Amino acid sequence: MTDLYQIKAQMRKEHRILKTRKFFRNKSVVIGAAVLLIMLALAVLAPVISPYDPLEVNVVNRLKSPCKEFLFGTDTFGRDLLSRILYGTSISMKVGVLVSGFSFVIGLFLGLYSGYYPKFGAVVMRFCDAVKAIPSLMLAIALVGVMGAGEKNVILTLIIVSIPDITRVARSITLQVKEQTYIEALQASGASNLRIIWLNIMPNVIPTVLVQVSFIFATVVISEASLSFLAVGIPMPEPSWGNIINEGKTVIFQSWWMIVCPGAFIAASVLGLNMLGEGLRDFLDPLTN
């Protein structure tokens, strides 16, 4: 019996090693995770590594091109663009993490229960259909217009817009797992619905939902920047990536760095998150394993 336990323990250890090797061999996951970690590190360390106050106005340095003193140049008010972009990273990552996190929790809950209980699912899916019937950005603009601009309202708006995506994915997987023979056996043996949902169905739903969360994170980064660019998101003079591009659009031919620098951060973040999502899908999806 002891030998059998040792063999099982050794097999589990080897399985973990193989999984770890497969994870790090997936270039999309590694590159995407590296980009995300760098962005999160910049967001956390922004107050420490920013060379200047992002709100400090100095008209003498107005629209200076990139140089040793100002690596990314300055904006129309003489503010250091690197400092503003770093603080903008904090805002974008904060919004992305909060929206993705709350959407994951709420969407997973709604998806599990709507898939397991048909009547409740009918109500939830009508809500999802109503939300997705309107283009996400247009709906976000309308909601922010009603609630008012500001970081909290932007986060709340993007959560509302993002929940249906998680809910639909979670519900779809729940419906598939619910029809499995072992679930029917658990129901016949008298197992509670609560136990079946959270202990037997949820572990099968989580991997696919996590992939969707990474794509939602990327969408949120673009949406937050778009709302700020349209002056209905993070209010000026807060250093959001969208605000910086909005300020730079009037001097685009004179000061290209005001568009290129924040745009590069947006592109890098979205590309990294999409690569992470694609890699996670290859790694976690049982159909590709």
What are the residue ranges of the model-derived segments?
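Hydrophobic alpha-helical transmembrane segments of membrane transport/permease proteins
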Residues: 42-77, 230-238
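C-terminal transmembrane helix and the adjacent membrane-cytosol boundary/short C-terminal tail
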Residues: 147, 160-161, 207, 211-217, ...
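Loop-to-helix entry region at the N-terminal start of transmembrane alpha-helices
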Residues: 83-96, 145-165, 257-263
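Glycine-rich helix-loop "coupling/hinge" segments at transmembrane-helix boundaries
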Residues: 144-147, 158, 174, 222-265, ...
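Transmembrane alpha-helical segments of polytopic membrane transport and secretion proteins
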Residues: 1-34, 275-289
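Transmembrane alpha-helix signature in integral membrane proteins
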Residues: 81-116
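Generic hydrophobic transmembrane alpha-helix motif, especially the helices
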Residues: 71, 75, 107, 112-116, ...
